[in-house]
A protein has these predicted regions:
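Polyanion-binding surfaces on beta-sheet-dominated domains and ring/shell assemblies
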Residues: 1-288
Length: 288
């Protein structure tokens, strides 16, 4: 097998193994956890952005952003901003990819200017993983048997990343698919929560998200969930870090309750989209 000798044969990013080394005493880890918690939340249980632990960031939704796409949506969740375009259904080009049911092709991409560190124009490993998670979640909600031998493309672009991009992408992609008249079992609403040793932070920002190089002790994790409220089913479950069963139950309960609150907002946005579509069709008929 040919090998590129000029390329570094190592991971794209790495951190010192000493951060993962277990100490004989747990005093250092407890001090790190306490200091981290003080950085994220003060003694009055108020976060940096003046939110309470169980408060979410302001949410803004809009459809019809991309005129060339069959369906599109835009979401703002605090300073996290994403746009999603849906194209198809289209005939599958490769015979090797032929299937009786329809297929979903999902692409998750960070804009080069979306993060503090400039991102590459080509997809990196993180974006490939997020694309796969997005596809697996949406496949559970889309009626793939309604468009056999065809493919629907879902393209998500992160314009600004301030935390919880996958959760925002799930909500945005679900709204874009609905606006494109793609049959679905239910809408998908995404939510995430950060676990600290003594408190749960709903809808974490970039600074509040779990980081493996800084959070390698127990009861310190991040959970992202894609939830179908009407069917009361979870279609995406991504957990990073270390948590016990009781804490996971509390985290799942918190995010599902938040998804139930967001569902009417998504439905209202979709209702306004349908009303505008019907109004435009009526105007075109009157003009003829």
């Amino acid at each position: 097998m040919p090998v590129d000798s000029r390329r570094l044969q190592g991971p794209e990013s790495a951190f010192s193994y000493t951060l993962l080394e277990k100490k004989d005493a747990n005093a250092e880890e407890s001090i790190l956890s306490a200091d981290m918690q003080k950085m994220l939340i003060d003694s009055k249980q108020i976060r940096k952005d003046k939110r309470k632990p169980t408060d979410a960031r302001p949410l803004f939704l809009r459809t019809g952003i991309i005129s060339q796409a069959k369906g599109s949506a835009y979401i703002e969740q605090g300073n996290t901003k994403l746009v999603c375009g849906v194209y198809g259904p289209r005939e599958v080009q490769k015979k090797s990819d032929f299937r009786l049911n329809g297929q979903l092709f999902c692409e998750f991409k960070f804009a080069p200017f979306s993060c503090q560190k400039r991102r590459s124009h080509q997809q990196d490993n993180e974006e490939l993983v997020l694309s796969g998670l997005l596809r697996e979640a949406l496949e559970a909600a889309v009626c793939l048997h309604h468009f056999p031998k065809a493919q629907v493309e879902v393209n998500v672009m992160v314009i600004e990343n301030d935390g919880s991009p996958l959760a925002a992408a799930l909500t945005c992609a679900s709204l874009a698919l609905s606006s494109a008249s793609i049959p679905m079992y239910d809408l998908v609403v995404g939510a995430s929560v950060r676990q600290l040793p003594k408190v749960l932070l709903l809808d974490p920002t970039k600074d509040e998200e779990w980081q493996p190089e800084l959070s390698h002790d127990q009861n310190n994790s991040n959970l992202t969930v894609g939830y179908m409220p009407s069917m009361q089913q979870v279609c995406a479950y991504v957990h990073e870090g270390v948590s016990n069963t009781e804490d996971l139950e509390q985290m799942l309960k918190l995010v599902t309750e938040y998804c139930l609150k967001v569902q009417p907002i998504v439905q209202l946005c979709l209702k306004e989209t349908v009303e505008k579509m019907l109004a435009n069709e009526g105007e075109n008929k009157d003009a003829e």
